[in-house]
Regions:
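Short Lys/Arg-enriched alpha/beta "domain-start" segment
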Residues: 2-46
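Conserved ATP-binding subdomain of kinase catalytic cores across diverse folds
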Residues: 52-268, 318, 333-377
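An alpha-helical support segment within catalytic cores of ATP-dependent transferases
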Residues: 126-131, 269-304
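All-alpha amphipathic helical-bundle segments outside canonical DNA-binding/catalytic cores
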Residues: 234-236, 409-424
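Long, amphipathic alpha-helical stalk/connector segments used for oligomerization, subunit docking
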Residues: 273, 286, 372-382, 414-422
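Pre-DFG segment of protein kinase catalytic domains
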Residues: 303, 321-324
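Conserved catalytic-loop position in the HRD/HxD motif
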Residues: 307, 312
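Active-site activation/catalytic loop segments of kinase-like enzymes and analogous catalytic loops
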Residues: 327-330, 335-404, 426-438
């Protein structure tokens, strides 16, 4: 950021006209992509020329209210023919004038030729523009596949300093955890992470999609879940093995801290009381929290994933991969966390809280699929849903607890593991209810 906060273009201070034009372009982009930013002032922090001429690239970072947004802009001659990557929105955002004259400005990630130039800036690799396609678009990032060889993710919303989720991925790569798409290059400027290039996971299937297919097969066929055509048990076991290896890798990368089970029990109560106070009077919940407070064995915390549900993983022919590290070890829930944060603000949390997140998500998949198939509830799919959930919970635990070394990180007794996971799941349920009641 320059002292005046107006950004720079090609090593020179932006003119007032350029600054206003870029601010208007950023505002237009936000309105189209999110429907937000009506009237919120835009302050251009950086305007970095990555490629001169036409097509050109100007990479813009701007402050919009409390957010820091990132928009790579492509520049082309007015009236020139452009072939945009298929998408729902018009990528043209306005006009911009630089040393090469007036240009049409557009979202660079919608133009395959410009994307290849942007990739060259980040990693100095050439790709065929005809083999560029968008594979993921969220409010926080856009991911493009290039020749089914590389995956290029550009972050739309930035944080000051290193990006927590990216930090987890890079740390796991450093310690040899190979259940991730290997990082090739990180795009970073002025202390901010702008994007990452990784290997492309060919043939990857979303974990959630596989789980939904499995439970739908069960609802269609009936009977024991292990006999259904899409039985998920073996995959749940492999997923548990992968999760344990991830936790051991995070332990190696960041170390561990002691946990306080009494504080965790208090956190569960505080989460449940505002949304479902009657749950705290149930005998099983009373006993659960008493058991949690009474635990005397060491309960370690690590830099955990933070929101490790079935939608954060994918399956390829080579096995399971963690494909999404959001929120980067900064969970929305507090049970299972250490009382002290790391120097960078990162939260240490029981690895079993990640396990609870994953197991909770399996139950949610079963319930959602049942509601989709039988909205009236007449088929009585609840029993099948619970049978599917039980089988895959058991398989996941078998895979997780069977990994060498994990008993030194989580409590060795299965009863203690049960108490911790059940308590963390209860908080997760409360967090979901709070979100639904907003």
């Amino acid at each position: 950021m320059t002292p005046s906060g107006t950004g720079r273009l090609g090593g020179r201070q932006l003119t007032e006209t350029q600054r206003l034009a870029l601010a208007e372009i950023v505002s237009s982009h936000l309105m189209r992509s999110t429907g937000e930013n009506d009237g919120v002032p835009v302050q251009v922090l950086e305007a970095e020329v990555l490629s001169r001429g036409r097509p050109g690239i100007v990479d813009v970072v701007a402050r919009v209210g409390e957010r820091t947004v990132h928009l790579p802009l492509g520049l082309r001659e007015p009236g020139g023919e452009t072939k945009f990557i298929a998408g729902d929105e018009d990528p043209v955002l306005g006009v911009f004038e630089d040393d090469d004259g007036l240009a049409v400005a557009f979202d660079a990630l919608h133009d395959a030729e410009v994307v290849t130039a942007l990739l060259w800036h980040v990693v100095a690799q050439e790709v065929d523009p005809g083999r560029v396609r968008q594979i993921r678009h969220t409010s926080e990032s856009v991911t493009l596949a290039l020749e089914d060889r590389l995956a290029f993710t550009v972050f739309s919303e930035l944080v000051d300093g290193p990006r927590p989720g990216l930090g987890l991925l890079l740390a796991l790569d450093e310690v040899g955890f190979n259940h991730i798409a290997a990082p090739v290059a990180v795009w970073r400027r002025s202390g901010r992470d702008l994007g990452i290039v990784q290997e492309f996971l060919a043939g990857a299937s979303s974990g959630r999609a596989l789980a939904v297919t499995s439970v739908r097969d069960l609802y269609a066929s009936g009977g024991p879940p292990e006999l259904a055509g899409g039985d998920f048990g073996a995959e749940a076991h492999r997923l548990g093995t992968m999760a344990a290896r991830m936790h051991l890798g995070l332990d190696e990368a960041f170390g561990r801290r002691p946990g306080d089970t009494k504080a965790w029990a208090d956190a569960v109560e505080e989460a449940v009381r505002p949304v479902a106070p009657m749950l705290l009077d149930r005998p099983d919940v009373v006993v659960l929290l008493e058991e949690l407070r009474a635990l005397t064995i060491p309960c370690h915390t690590i830099r955990s994933h933070g929101d490790f549900h079935i939608g954060r993983v994918a399956r390829t022919e080579q096995g399971w991969y963690v494909t999404d590290f959001s929120p980067g070890g900064k969970p929305a829930t507090t049970a299972g966390t250490s009382s002290t944060a790391a120097d960078d603000g990162a939260v240490f949390r029981s690895p079993l809280a990640d396990v609870a997140d994953l197991l909770w998500s399996l139950g949610a998949v079963a319930d959602e699929a049942a509601a989709e198939r039988d909205p009236s509830g007449r088929e009585g799919l609840g029993e099948l849903a619970r049978a599917w959930e039980r089988r895959n919970r058991q398989a996941f635990f078998a895979g997780y607890l069977g990994v060498a070394g994990i008993s030194g990180l989580v409590p060795p007794g299965r009863e203690a593991v049960r108490v911790l996971v059940t308590a963390f799941e209860l908080e997760r349920v409360a967090a979901r209810m709070a979100w639904q009641q907003r």
